Amino acid sequence: MPFDLVIEIPNEPGALARVAAAISDAGVNLAAATCMGTAEQVELHVLVPHAEAARHALALSQLAVTREREVVVVDVEDRPGVLADLTRKVATSGVDLDLVYVATNNRLVFGSSDLDGLKAALDE
């Protein structure tokens, strides 16, 4: 079961490396990462298969997970229009997406407060 963890880190050299090292040193695969922020602070999203192990490893490095949730990861073809096709299916099902990012190996990560509806929409 994949999880999206959010860690707030300072926007400074080495901050992302510290998070990545903490997770990988615990033997947890970091399958994707994306971050957005300001000049001072960044909200980092990481995709991990084992939330508890990643959270524990981050805590040992004095890094706190501010939000955590299960997400849907979809294997996709690397071609023009794939994101449009999938998000159209989700929209037609009436599911509101609040998170989308790209993971390794041609996969898309989707988040919604309606996780069951999202899974159903993507299975159609």
Whereabouts are the PLM-identified features?
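A conserved regulatory-domain signal marking ACT and ACT-like small-molecule sensing domains
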Residues: M1-E124
